[in-house]
């Protein structure tokens, strides 16, 4: 091989090496951004996913705060209504009503 050919072939190899380091550098930058430290290989994928999800959830909650201040949520069911409906289903001796289940054929025929 001639010297020019060797230089021409060597250049793509250097680019491949540079690309590998660039990819590793990008991964390290993403790990730092996601607050991921070095863990044993068996734990790293799970830990990194958990931290990414936690960060996304915090960002989601922060975005929801301004939205809640702009548009109030609909009124919730009051506890008074809930307690009155429960007390209506309770007998005076504090026992609760028991529903009798009938076979479907019996209810259709009668």
UniProtKB/Swiss-Prot annotation:
Region of interest called Disordered, as start-end residue ranges on this chain: 63-99
Descriptive protein name: IQ domain-containing protein J
Biased composition (Low complexity): 76-87
Entry-linked Pfam families: IQCJ-SCHIP1
Protein encoded by which gene: Iqcj
Coiled-coil regions listed: none
Domain IQ stretches: 47-67
Feature: compositional bias, Polar residues: 88-99
Matching InterPro entries: IQ_domain_protein (IPR053113), IQCJ-SCHIP1_N (IPR029362)
Source taxon at top rank: Eukaryota
